[in-house]
UniProtKB/Swiss-Prot annotation:
It comes from Parvibaculum lavamentivorans (strain DS-1 / DSM 13023 / NCIMB 13966). InterPro entries: Aldolase_TIM, Methyltransferase_A, RlmN_N, RNA_MTrfase_RlmN, rRNA_lsu_MTrfase_RlmN/Cfr, rSAM. HAMAP family: RNA_methyltr_RlmN. The keyword Methyltransferase applies. Belongs to the radical SAM superfamily. RlmN family. Specifically methylates position 2 of adenine 2503 in 23S rRNA and position 2 of adenine 37 in tRNAs. m2A2503 modification seems to play a crucial role in the proofreading step occurring at the peptidyl transferase center and thus would serve to optimize ribosomal fidelity. It holds the Pfam family RlmN_N. GO terms for biological process: rRNA base methylation; tRNA methylation. This is Dual-specificity RNA methyltransferase RlmN.
Length: 399
């Protein structure tokens, strides 16, 4: 059996999608204090109460104010009437034979009775670490031709709370809160990668605020060295990302010349390779200790020649970098094939001999469409499938 499908419906307070109460998850500390001040808390209590709520949200994983017993019963009731701290709705959960887990999440729509859009989050367990792949948008505007998400039109940006909410929900599922019976030092989620659905730099403020919450030392406490933001090359935002977010940077490069990259990553027509690499050289904090990762999907007969490998080495000269070679993960209707494994190894050898670390990413979660480049909202997949069936039926001759 390729995968275990544990599809289930779990209705939560978030399911209604129309709560008029503002959600506290994802608010930075200053914004949380602003919300509590507007709520009516006196100035001399703001810092203390914000700290207590912060601890409840991000150290204990509470989804109900009643569990925040450091607050008075009266205050807990008033907070519950004014604010939401529930989780996103899990529509389905799938588990791969390799341990990878994927959650399809429904976001609030803001309209009573109307289901909200959906987004996917993936957890990848490895020896000694666990990586959570987080989405920043529903759909994407970039239409990268090798990426499944790129075939789904942008629906909307995620809020900071919805970005942080993916991490909170994953910690729930993995039993990673103190009450989950797990040693708090034995973390299952050790790394966060902003490599899910969407282009993070086209949702800059929400991604920035979410990662500020995630890296706060008194909450989820993930070091910025364990957080990687991947961009397809939104050049004007790269320097700002280094200054205001300061996490590790990954570039979806995938080609060594503008003609090829224009086809694979149409954004390249706006920000060509030379401009992108110049922005990388100037990325704040880049050094041999904080190298930029260049992602390179291996496409048979497109970008995988040994000449391409040599050109890649020349391009990245004088940039502290590592190169992540990604075997192409197929999806229905994709126009590409994965490079032969022998060719991938030869390509990696050229890069390695030039002095660059070039690990070949092991495909994870392919059987549940959770691997790199395979994410897409399930409702969009279903609509496409129904449309295909309808077109096929219409094409059948009438007896």
């Amino acid at each position: 059996m390729a995968s275990i499908d544990i599809a289930h419906e779990r209705k939560t307070a978030a399911t209604a999608g129309a709560s008029a109460r503002p959600h506290l998850a994802g608010l930075t500390r200053p914004l949380l204090m602003d919300a509590l001040k507007a709520f009516g808390l006196p100035d001399n209590q703001l810092r203390m109460r914000a700290g207590q709520i912060w601890n409840g949200l991000y150290n204990r994983g509470f989804t109900d104010f009643e569990r925040m017993t450091t607050l008075s019963k009266e205050l807990r009731g008033k907070l519950a009437d004014a604010f939401d701290i529930s989780r996103l709705e899990i529509v389905t959960e799938q588990k791969s034979v390799d341990g990878t887990r994927k959650w399809l999440l429904r976001l609030p729509s803001g309209i009573p009775g109307v289901p909200g859009p959906e987004v996917e989050t993936v957890y990848i367990p490895e020896e000694g670490r666990g990586t959570l792949c987080v989405s920043s948008q529903v759909g994407c505007t970039l239409t990268c031709t090798f990426c499944h998400t790129g075939t789904q039109k942008l629906v909307r940006n995620l809020t900071a709370g919805e970005i942080v909410g993916q991490i909170l929900l994953a910690r729930d599922a993995l039993g990673e809160w103190p009450d989950g019976g797990r040693n708090s030092e034995d973390r299952l989620i050790t790394n966060i990668v902003m490599m899910g659905m969407g282009e993070p730099l086209y949702n800059f403020e929400n991604v920035r605020d979410a990662l500020e919450v995630v890296s706060d030392g008194e909450g989820l406490s993930l070091s910025k060295r364990r957080i990687t933001l991947s961009t397809s090359g939104v050049v004007p935002m790269i320097e700002r990302a280094g200054e205001e977010i300061g996490c590790m940077l990954a570039i979806s490069l995938h080609a060594v010349d503008d003609e090829t990259r224009n086809r694979l990553v149409p954004l390249n027509k706006k920000y060509p390779i030379a401009e992108l690499l110049e922005a990388c050289r100037n990325y704040p904090g880049v050094s041999n200790a904080r190298r930029i990762t260049f992602e390179y999907v291996m496409l048979k007969g497109v970008n995988d020649s040994l000449e391409d490998a040599k050109a890649l080495v020349r391009l990245l000269k004088h940039i502290p970098a590592k190169i992540n070679l990604i075997p192409f993960n197929p999806w229905p209707g994709s126009p590409y094939e994965c490079s032969d494994w022998e060719q991938i190894e030869k390509f990696a050898d050229v890069v390695n001999r030039a002095g660059y670390a070039s690990p070949v990413r092991t495909p994870r979660g392919r059987d549940i469409m959770a691997a790199c480049g395979q994410l897409k909202s399930e409702t969009v997949k279903a609509r496409a499938s129904e449309r295909f069936k309808g077109e096929k039926a219409a094409a059948q001759p009438i007896a």
